[in-house]
Amino acid sequence: MMFPAVAAPPRRLPGERLQRSQNPVETSWLSFRILATRGPCVTSTFLFLTVAFLGLSWVSVAVAAHAEHPEDSATNFLFSFAENSLANREPPEDSAARPSSRSGGAERRRLDSLIPGFLKRRRIFKQLRPVDEFQLREFQEASSKVKAQFFSAGHSKVTFVDRPSAALLSFLHLEEEDVPYGVVIKAIPYDAFDFYESVAEPYIHRMFDDPRKFPYVVPVLAALRSTSKRVLYLVLPLYRELPETVDEEARSLDFVLLLAEMAMAVCQLHERNLAHRDLKEDNFLVSPEGHIVVSDLATLDITDNKSFLIGTSGYMPPETRSSYLLRKGYKRSRYGEKTDVYSLGVAFRHLAFMLEGLGVQVPHRTQLAKLIKKMTSPDPEKRPLIGEVMEDPFFASVDFRLVRQRAGKHPFKKLPGADLLAERQRARLEAREKADAAAKAADNAEVPAAKSPAGKTGGAGTLSGDRDRAGSGEKPAERAEEEKGRGRGAQTHEGNHDRTDDAGREELREGPGDQKPSGEENREGGQPPGQREEQREGTGLEEGFNKEDAQES
């Protein structure tokens, strides 16, 4: 029986069936079919984004994980900062009295940022000494003030500790006489995508770790990392706040010297091509000796570098907030020395108003008003540099050479016990220098110091020859075979020793600015101690950065 031919019904596409279907299960299935059949690119893109997100999440968690730290973490942390010390670059002696009025960035170093690259930041982070907040109540209180979430972190907070506990002093390896006025714990939170950028402030503080070279920067006692939270801690000595101290000692302070020390603090930063970018009277502190120090170095950066909106409202110059994009932080602005000069001029004006509000006459008020007007000029080209500010007639009675060395008077009164504290600090610095010198001597003692051929030095030459053969990959059997022939072995040994000695001398003489030794040679390249110290202090942050960049590449 033959069936009549019937035309096949037209095939419906998944999209048409989806439009007519009302069943949610069928709708979902048809949607998946459409995605699988008609959208292979969409499917692959979706899978790629999913895998990328999971991989990025894994990397961020691994980066933020706190690894265990070796016992000598505090020592390694100090050495890691000593390698790259941009701040250790001393200014020329002829500029000790008044700095030159060079243009901003005229002596710029070839750096994109003040802090190092990712690999070195990670190494510094791992070398931070870990601290458990639950064992020390001061850190527990400090950590409770900040919030560190996975995707975002809040602002840093400070905690004042007038009387540190015995457990805290023991943990910091301090005595009560070392911090007679108390300490400040600054908690710095960070998120999982921080990539170790939170080490910037501890890194910068360690650059200014020697108070004898940088007396106008607040010292740091310890830099720590939490074992249970995404928080870093800076432990600083408790100093007096500038506005409160001016309020208390308004009738006895030396106002001109106060402004001169504030200018000198900024000058020491600008001499090293650094800009603070958030100068205000609240970021200046008064030391126990009655002198000024600058604090809050988290905003420090290379001069003339571009950055998004940073600073305090009312202290920022017009060029950093002249447009909507700048004010909202959508566009970067250039921050340089004249940016700090504007902020410093606003701080001068606030302090002068504060003094007049307390019924105290401002000395040389007319000259100060002219100076502040120039410092706060809306046009950066008309704004003076910090060297020109210090040369203003308002500071005609100030010897900035003494101000730089802090050899003269102090604008505020000394606190009781300030002289004893200064003596203890000097003793601690000398002890640390001796320990560093002993460690360096121990390291140099491991380097072969042979200066003559093996036939004249005996045992020393033999040790050097063995090291040469070991470094060249020679096996013990080959050494035994070589020693069978005395004459030929002695000649080979002597030749190897001479080549090694020459290579060692060339390696010790490497580096810019090295000179040939004069006089008696020593273990550190045959240079007198004074010359070695100059070369060590002259090693800037640029050299360390170049090494780090080479490692990263």
Swiss-Prot record:
Catalysed reactions listed for this entry: L-seryl-[protein] + ATP = O-phospho-L-seryl-[protein] + ADP + H(+); L-threonyl-[protein] + ATP = O-phospho-L-threonyl-[protein] + ADP + H(+)
Names of the cofactor(s): Mg(2+)
One Pfam family named in its UniProt record: Pkinase
Disrupted gene: phenotype observed: In BALB/c mice infected with knockout tachyzoites (type I strain RH), virulence is not affected.
Enzyme class: transferase
UniProt keyword list: ATP-binding, Kinase, Magnesium, Metal-binding, Nucleotide-binding, Secreted, Signal, Transferase
Active site: 278 (proton acceptor)
Region (Disordered): 1-20, 88-107, 432-553
Effect of residue 109 to A: Loss of proteolytic cleavage by ASP5
Domains: entry comment: The protein kinase domain has an atypical kinase fold which lacks the glycine-rich loop that is critical for ATP binding in canonical protein kinase domains.
Its biological purpose: Probable serine/threonine-protein kinase.
Protein's name in the database: Serine/threonine-protein kinase WNG2
Source species taxonomy: Eukaryota, Sar, Alveolata, Apicomplexa, Conoidasida
